A protein has these predicted regions:
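A short, N-terminal "cap"/entry segment at the start of jelly-roll beta-barrel domains
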Residues: 1-37, 42-47, 114-117
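A structure-centric signal for secondary-structure junctions around beta-strands
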Residues: 32, 51, 95-96
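Short acidic-glycine-tyrosine-enriched beta hairpin
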Residues: 68-83
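Ligand-binding loop in jelly-roll beta-barrel domains
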Residues: 84-109
Length: 117
């Protein structure tokens, strides 16, 4: 069950549009954050977004391309993509699904001057 403060994978999957529609659904919005589930089938058609985003892989594995680099991913992995950066999932399993969180202002957030690292 999904409430306004608890998102379940089962409810998110049941709310995805049927193919051939893009397999994405927003589930929660708060402040600048928009949270959804992304489960592309076959090909990932997305391009750069106007806001920073975080993916948390729920199931499946494959490779992720970001700004010309390609890296493998699997369940539990977290992927960060700054606003405006080209990216996509490639060679992913048929059951791939990831939580996605868009946040911050258009153009992305700037690092804090006093942030560690």
């Amino acid at each position: 069950m999904t409430t306004e403060w608890l998102l379940t994978v089962a409810d998110a999957l049941s709310r995805l549009p049927a193919p051939p529609e893009e397999q994405f659904v927003y589930l929660l919005e708060h402040g600048t954050a928009k949270i959804g589930l992304y489960a592309p089938r076959g090909v990932d058609p997305q391009g750069p977004h106007q806001r920073d985003e975080i993916y948390l892989v729920w199931r499946g594995q494959g490779s992720f391309e970001r700004a010309g680099e390609r890296h493998p991913f699997g369940p539990g992995d977290l992927i960060f993509v700054p606003a405006g950066m080209a990216h996509r999932f490639v060679d992913f399993d048929d059951d791939f699904a990831a939580w996605v969180i868009f946040y911050g202002p258009k153009g992305g957030e700037q690092p804090l001057e006093d942030s560690p690292g």
